[in-house]
């Protein structure tokens, strides 16, 4: 069964673009190469400029655990920790149904 992970970062005021640049450098290539990811969305909160959320859909719970223990994820956590207000909120879910389609890249 596919599982989802929702991560919410509260960044220090004005740090959102810097956190995104670090994510783009360290995590995006790892996510693109990871066969365990079925879908991934990196999102900015519309009402709060200091909140970033990510939705990750994995093939199963083991794939999620494996990715969250990779060197790339560990490097990202270290690189952004001083830009965050505190640790991220992580919510794990069982995905009952989803629809995904390829979106054009910016």
Regions found by a protein language model. Give the residues of each.
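Short, well-ordered beta-strand segments in beta-rich or mixed alpha/beta enzyme
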Residues: 3-10, 39-68, 94
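Glycine-rich beta-strand-turn "strand-cap" elements at beta-sheet edges
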Residues: 2, 39-50, 75-106
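An amphipathic, aromatic/His-enriched active-site/gating alpha helix that lines ligand/cofactor pockets
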Residues: 25-39, 57-91
């Amino acid at each position: 069964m596919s599982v989802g992970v929702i991560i919410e970062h509260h960044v220090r005021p004005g740090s959102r673009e810097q956190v995104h640049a670090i994510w783009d450098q360290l995590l995006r290539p790892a996510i693109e190469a990871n066969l365990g990811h079925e879908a991934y969305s990196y999102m900015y909160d519309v009402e709060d400029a200091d909140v970033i959320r990510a939705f990750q859909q994995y093939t199963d719970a083991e794939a999620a655990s494996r990715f969250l223990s990779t060197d790339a994820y560990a490097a990202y956590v270290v690189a952004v920790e001083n830009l965050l207000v505190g640790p991220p909120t992580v919510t794990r879910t069982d995905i009952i149904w989803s629809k995904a389609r390829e979106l054009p890249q910016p």
